[in-house]
Amino acid sequence: MSQPISIQFTRFSAFYSPLIATIAGGFLKEEGFEPKYSIAPLGKSAIAGLADGSVHVAQSAPSQGFAPLEKGEMPPAVHFAQINEKDGFFITARRPDPKFTWEKLKSGRILVDHGGQPLAMFKYACFKNGLDWKSLPIVDAGIDKMDQAFRNGTGDYIHQQGPAPQQLEHDGVGHVVASVGEAIGPLAFSSLAATRQWLATDEARRFTRAYRKARAWLIDTPARRIAEVEASFFPNIHRDVLTQTIATYQKLGCWTRHVEITRPAFEVTLDVFQHAGLITRRHKYEDVIAQPPA
């Protein structure tokens, strides 16, 4: 008899394909699990589900551990495996611009995702490109409304996670001109989180074994085949768009072979959050990160 396992996403997109493929590709079923997944309500982290016991594994980010640490409290969960080792957001313009530079953002209004981590990363990417983000004509159209606002004519640029930018390209509304992940480089961006108690179980070891297999498959498999497997998870996304998005993330190097969240990657995330003024000190790796169950 299959064992139920509950997985919750904080956000849901093709960017999280390593976890989606673990479900869609049958890797969890091979380990005796019957997976069910959900998406946390907008503005709520999936970490809350771990804390109340309704969720076994959450798609989250190591930075979620910073808020309780800033208050002198230990986080209710730890992050034990990476999903993405680079930011997965893009800058999309209304017209193709093969000579785009970040400096051009000064001359056009840009709709920016104002979620905590996406905004911090955008600020840091601007910094890395010699820009003060405060000098930019930024528009906050709302995370769930910004895509339609751009389609309706608001702004000259938009900052989004895939597959939204690729869908804009497919629809003839925009053209991707830059990658935030490319601007910043490797860091601890998105991850799998669980409680320390759950990570000590055989269930956690079996889950991690399935996740390692899914991740290797994702790296070695053509994007079109991955899109076929994941298509039912994205009923409103054109198959070609899903394929292009997955291929873009493969090429960008978001999905590396190791599942561990490395110390160097974590240190860069601390750099980003210090730059954004969201943390007052550099938190310990061990307070946020755990090693994957063997």
Residue spans for each PLM region:
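Predominant activation on well-ordered alpha-helical scaffold segments within soluble catalytic domains
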Residues: 20, 63-66, 123, 166, ...
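Short, glycine-/small- and polar/acidic-enriched structural segments
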Residues: 2-131, 137-140, 156-162, 173-178, ...
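Hinge/cleft segment of the Venus flytrap/periplasmic-binding protein
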Residues: 282-294
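Basic/polar N-terminal segments that are highly enriched at the extreme N-terminus
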Residues: 1-2, 294
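Pocket-lining segment of extracytoplasmic ligand-binding domains
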Residues: 145-233
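Phosphate-coordinating loops and pocket residues in cytosolic domains that bind phosphorylated ligands
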Residues: 107, 170, 290
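Secondary-structure end/capping motifs
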Residues: 200-280
